[in-house]
Amino acid sequence: MSRPLTVVQLLPALDSGGVERGTLEIARALVAAGHRSLVVSAGGRLVDALTREGSEHIALDVGRKSLASLWLVPKLRRLFAERGVDIVHARSRLPAWLGFLAWRGMDVATRPRFVTTVHGLNSVGFYSAVMLRGERVICVSQTVRDYVLRHYPDSDASRLRVIARGVDPLEFPHGHRPDRDWRKRFVAEHPALSTPAPWLCLVGRGSRIKGHRHAIELVADLRHQGSDARLILLGVREPGRERYVDELRRLAQRLGVGDAVVMTAPRRDVRDVMASCRLVLQLSSQPEAFGRTVLEALHLGVPVLGYDIGGVGEQLRALFAPGAVAPGDPAALAERARVLLQQDLRPPPFSSHGLAQMQEATLSLYRELQEAPRRCI
């Protein structure tokens, strides 16, 4: 039986987001498999959950964009040596630079193995290229792998591994329906939803690239076609985004659907909101690396309508092809929405993209690399 590993994950902070969630998911899997899990970050609200599940958190501000951060390089090198670290897994660019510099200064024969994960379609250049310095480079989708090879043609394709993010089917079970009390409370909070009209939902922070305008225009187009609907912009109300929210409200009023649009702050009951909708929208104007919301909705059995670009298009083509539409064609978007609502098409259950599969693939990669021949990078 192979010996337990000591794995350290590096990221800026542990507050919220897909990178942070993935870090906790791998930390949990390491502990469950009998390995030692260390996480280095500046801290955040997820630290308690991390340590409760058996990992150790080491507070270092490896995400601070300052020359002073270079002083952390010898600290990290000492940490790797003193803790007997087997795998260093960097999940963000600045932590990757600090981790790489610390790792590169160690003895090739005894230093840890170095892994990176490319979580996004980062700007192309020297700073981002550090994410390709890993002895193994995890890409969270085929879209990311293609992007890396297109923009960094000298990359060693043999070191790239596609390991898609996973969704826990127990957390997002197919056919889930929230209880009546939840729905009553939610409608009481948002009286615009009290009509029989179907609900549409777009989950995303208050950013212009998330497609909120396109969603409002879609609801207006549906109304003009005689198909009434209600739109929930879940998570758009954030501190500092008040002007943007006002802009969206004015747009809805100008298009005659001010009574049909609900805008909320980020919520913990995203699963129940999505499960109550007839359509979940993913209309980001820029390609995304993955699009976790798409996968969560499809796992619930809720149709997703999204642009056929990036990781969103990749998932829809594989799991729910009727939901993929070309960007930049509002008429086609409205027609596809009308058809999906009218025919009540539902994605069938599927076993791929599970959380356990992602965890198993990542731990297998660690073990594969630990046993692989060493070489200078």
Place the predicted regions along the sequence by residue:
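A conserved mid-protein helix/loop that constitutes part of the nucleotide-sugar donor-binding site
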Residues: 17-25, 198, 202-221
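Acidic donor-binding loop of glycosyltransferase active sites
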Residues: 275-289, 302
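A charged, aromatic-enriched C-terminal amphipathic alpha-helix characteristic of glycosyltransferases
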Residues: 18, 171-178, 342-374
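Active-site donor-binding acidic/aromatic loop of nucleotide-activated sugar
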Residues: 240-245, 258-267, 273
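A conserved, positively charged/aromatic
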Residues: 104, 108-142, 154
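Conserved acidic donor-binding segment of nucleotide-sugar-dependent glycosyltransferases
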Residues: 318-331, 339-343
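Short hydrophobic beta-strand element within catalytic cores of glycosyltransferases
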Residues: 39, 303-306
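Short His-centered aromatic/hydrophobic patch
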Residues: 90-96, 118
